[in-house]
């Protein structure tokens, strides 16, 4: 085996939740480019189909879109069952679904809180649980990658209390699952992106004053590119190259959390 073979995903299968847009789509494309067959999921079947076709065209790997609601146990279980039926098994799980509510904490409604928590935390737990069970029962030494945020470590912007709470919990859940499932050869790690130009951050990027303020605090002096800046780290964490790396948080932020 050569060093490049360690990073190859040929013959592997992956499920990327939140894979039709932004960071999730970038990760899905990277996995496919490394040879994996991939299912991407989001709420919109149209978005899934469009992104899956683009990924297949650009990488030559199989990519299928399956719409799902990951905020419910039933929705996640159906998604996992359909993915297994489509790909045969799941070697790699990426949790990258995202949503947020931006408003002062005193104005938050219970529905606002639940809307974010159900996707950013509950959905991640349900997906890890369902896919983890599949990996254990099938004796698959799988790879789970959860997408957290730098906001779990530093609160980079105000008015996102539910988002920050969820992302912090995802980091600790990642460590807990890593400890619990290491005995099965399953690794669980988290990525913590900084400021990437995605639909979720569009409201910030389109405000010139905020955009300039953020760039002043990023040593790399640019925002992340979801199509390229997650490629290397996601392939590494999904491959045999990271089989002894688990329970870790990887900051992909252009140096933001260093200062």
Identify the residue ranges that each predicted region occupies.
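Active-site helix of classical SDR
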Residues: 128, 166, 174
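Short C-terminal tail/terminal secondary-structure segment
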Residues: 2-5, 246-259
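Short, small/polar-rich loop/turn modules that mediate ligand/substrate recognition or access, typified
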Residues: 94, 182-187, 245-247
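Residue(s) in the substrate-gating loop at a strand-loop-helix junction
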Residues: 149
